[in-house]
Amino acid sequence: MADAEAPLTILYFAWLRERTGTSLESVTPPAAVRTVGELVAWLAGRSAGHALAFANLRTVRCAVNQDFAEPATRVGPGDEVAFFPPVTGG
């Protein structure tokens, strides 16, 4: 069980990294932030770059602790949350 005070580790890849201006940040969101969707809304308010990164959520994918996640996926202290563009194969 993670320490209730442990921050979330947020990873940004590709153009999300460029728009937010960072590849990694450690954040402690408000206790009311319990899902990926709530986290995205909170992160979008951190800066203009964050708002731009999350402006079109159809082009953003997420993983929590290296498992693909949906907006309703729960997040909590100590989790690693990664944001990246859709992956394509060929």
For every predicted segment, state its role.
Residues 1-89:
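Ubiquitin-like/PB1-type beta-grasp interaction modules and other compact soluble beta-rich domains
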